[in-house]
């Protein structure tokens, strides 16, 4: 089984100040802005060859989310064969947070925690879906 880091995700209260910070400090390039179904803004930035995801915090009136906190939210680990990777990790003793799901056709996700509580996202993203979203610049994929 082969794995690689796909992205790191950071939750922020003021997403635009974070975008500005990473652009000014690290010459980050915005590759995608989106607002998924729950209405929170998400911005993907490219820094060199790597991807950074900034996620806006929800409002205090929203229901509590067990994954909701400021700072590094999760590390996305890419799996070429999602089903095989999910089975492999379960066999190795991984405890998943909920069941795998597909938030958008072509994107498969599952969350688990490492022993100290950090959240890991197992992800398989159809490159064609992501490239199409990037080409549009603002997509709900």
Give the ranges of each region predicted by the language model:
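Core segments of cupin and vicinal oxygen chelate
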Residues: 2, 10-52
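Exposed loop/turn and edge beta-strand positions of beta-sandwich/beta-sheet ligand-binding modules
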Residues: 4, 39-41, 71, 106
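N-terminal beta-strand motif that seeds the catalytic metal site of vicinal oxygen chelate
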Residues: 1-17, 72-77, 126-141
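Conserved catalytic-core motifs of GNAT/GCN5-like acyltransferases
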Residues: 9, 29-36, 101-103, 124-130
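A short, acidic/glycine-rich surface segment
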Residues: 31, 39, 59-65, 98, ...
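Active-site beta-strand termini and strand-to-loop segments that position acidic
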Residues: 45-48, 112-115, 125
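Vicinal oxygen chelate
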Residues: 12-16, 69-119
């Amino acid at each position: 089984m082969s794995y690689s880091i796909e992205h790191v995700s950071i939750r922020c209260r003021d997403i635009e100040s974070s975008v500005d910070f990473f652009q000014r400090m690290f010459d980050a390039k915005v590759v995608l802005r989106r607002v998924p179904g729950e209405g929170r803004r998400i911005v993907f930035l490219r820094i060199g060859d790597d991807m950074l995801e900034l996620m806006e915090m929800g409002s205090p009136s929203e229901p509590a989310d067990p994954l909701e906190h400021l700072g590094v939210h999760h590390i996305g680990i890419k799996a070429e064969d999602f089903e095989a990777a999910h089975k492999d990790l379960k066999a190795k003793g991984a405890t998943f947070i909920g069941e795998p799901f597909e938030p958008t056709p072509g994107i498969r996700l599952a969350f688990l925690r490492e022993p100290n509580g950090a959240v890991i996202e197992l992800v398989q993203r159809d490159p064609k879906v992501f490239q199409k979203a990037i080409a549009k610049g603002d997509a709900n994929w």
